[in-house]
């Protein structure tokens, strides 16, 4: 059975979810990347949309006008780690509960997710057109002066995913744990190879 989170998301909705789980999102998803984070945290400019209990997507979409409506053409994730220095404060100030992106995030986001009860989840790279099909409607757009990729596109989505949980509300970090595990497995293998093939060193 699919685990589907529906906005507005509450802290108790997240407490039983763990890293490695696969979930889906129904409700409000707002594209929000580098400049948006900088405006809020560095410039102290309030975001013109209430993100409390909502989800953001580290993404730079391609959209087109269809009559008087905007239509999502492609929306793939961008590298979440670029927002690492801002994400803890961003979660605290906005009350956002789901951060969607590509790749993992670091200890600051981990701390923010644990303290303020949020998740970081990974949307598979290379699936931007699939993601666009899961956007039912673009309901609003803000900060259009930033250009298409950096604008805040407020989307209504249905069963958006799959989303792999990389940081949960208990301080677990899937990517960090995997890096440690891979290093532990790699080192003895490299040492053994080096015994037989000396020029590798």
UniProtKB/Swiss-Prot annotation:
Query: Which BP terms does GO give this entry?
Result: response to heat; tartrate catabolic process
Keywords tagged on the record: Lyase
Entry's Gene Ontology molecular function annotations: L(+)-tartrate dehydratase activity
Stated induction or repression of this protein's expression: Induced by tartrate, via TtdR.
Organism, as annotated: Escherichia coli (strain K12)
Question: What protein name does the entry list?
Answer: L(+)-tartrate dehydratase subunit beta
Pfam families per record: Fumerase_C
Q: One Gene Ontology cellular component annotation?
A: catalytic complex
User: EC number(s) of the enzyme?
Assistant: 4.2.1.32
Keyword Lyase in the entry? The reply is: yes
- What's the family? Belongs to the class-I fumarase family.
Q: How does it assemble?
A: Heterotetramer of two alpha and two beta subunits.
Q: Which residues form the active site?
A: 37
Q: What class of enzyme is it?
A: lyase
Matches recorded under InterPro entries: Fe-S_hydro-lyase_TtdB-typ_cat, Fe-S_hydroAse_TtdB_cat_sf
As its record notes, the protein acts as a catalyst of:
(2R,3R)-tartrate = oxaloacetate + H2O
Superkingdom per UniProt = Bacteria
């Amino acid at each position: 059975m699919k685990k589907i989170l529906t906005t507005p998301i509450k802290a108790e909705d997240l407490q039983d979810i763990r890293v490695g789980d696969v979930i889906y999102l129904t409700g409000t998803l707002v594209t929000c990347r580098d400049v948006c984070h900088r405006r809020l945290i560095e410039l102290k400019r309030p975001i013109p949309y209430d993100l409390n209990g909502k989800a953001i997507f580290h993404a730079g979409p391609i959209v087109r006008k269809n009559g008087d409506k905007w239509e999502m053409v492609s929306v793939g994730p961008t590298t979440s780690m670029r927002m690492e220095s801002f994400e803890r404060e961003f979660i605290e100030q906005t009350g956002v509960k789901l951060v969607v992106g590509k790749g993992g995030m670091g200890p600051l986001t981990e701390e923010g997710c644990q303290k303020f009860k949020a998740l970081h989840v990974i949307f598979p790279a290379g699936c931007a057109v699939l993601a666009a099909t899961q956007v039912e409607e673009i309901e609003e757009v803000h900060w259009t002066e930033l250009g298409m990729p950096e604008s805040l596109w407020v989307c209504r989505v249905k069963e958006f995913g799959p989303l792999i949980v990389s940081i949960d509300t208990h301080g677990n970090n899937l990517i960090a744990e995997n890096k440690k595990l891979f290093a532990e497995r790699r080192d003895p293998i490299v040492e053994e190879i080096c015994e037989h093939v000396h020029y590798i060193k």
